Amino acid sequence: GRFSDLLTELNIPFPKFGIAESAEEATLLADSLDFPLLVRPSYVLGGQGMKIVINKQELEEHVINLLKSIPGNKLLIDHYLDGAIEAEADAICDADGNVYIIGIMEHIEPCGVHSGDSNATLPPFNLGEFVMQQIKDHTEKIARALQTVGLINIQFAVKNDIVYIIEANPRASRTVPFIAKAYGEPYVNYATKVMLGHNKVTDFTFNPQLKGYAIKQPVVSIS
C-alpha cells in the first residue's frame, strides 16, 4: 500500500503484512507472513473483528466468519509481533512542518489489544531512552511526510528495542482529551487554531504539568 511505501522510503520498520479477500488468499499469505497473525477487516472502527490466529485452521475459520458478517470487505493480515509492547504518540503539526509531540503513552496489555480497550500510562513506565527517541523520530518523520496540519496519532509495537509502526491516523484521537487533562494544557484549542491557519505550532508556549503517572482506563457501558 501507499503507507507501507512511505515507511520504506522513510526507513521506518513495520510488520510484514498482506491483504486478502478470501480464505484461499489468506492461507497463501500465511506462508510468507509466518504465524502468529493479526487479522482484521478494513474500514471498521474500534477493532471490530480483530483476532490473533496461530495456525491455518484458525485463520480460515476467522476469515470465513468475517466475510460472512462483512461481505466484500478486504482483510488486513499482519505478522503479529509476539511479546511486543504497544505504545502510541499524539502530536500537533502545522503547514510549515513544525511538530510538537503532546504525549507518548505505553499500553499495559500486550500488543494486539485494541487501543480503545487497553489501559495505558502517561508517560511510559518501561520504555528506555533509545526506544523513546525512535518513537519521537518516527512521529516527526511521518507527520511531516503526510503533510499533517492539526493532530495525528501514531501507534507502535516495540520488540527487542526496535520500534515498528502499526498505524497512523492524521486526526484527533481518543487519547488527546486524556493527555490534555493530565498535563493541564488546552491541546485541542491549539490544534484547532493551527488547522484554521490562525497560528503555527511555534506560536504556543507548551508547559505540561504532571506529577507521577496518569492512567487511562477503558469505560464499558453494560445494560
Predicted stretch roles:
Residues 1, 10, 33-36, 46, ...:
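ATP-dependent carboxylate activation and anion-phosphoryl transfer catalytic cores
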Residues 1-50:
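A conserved helix-loop-beta module that forms one wall/lid of the active-site cleft
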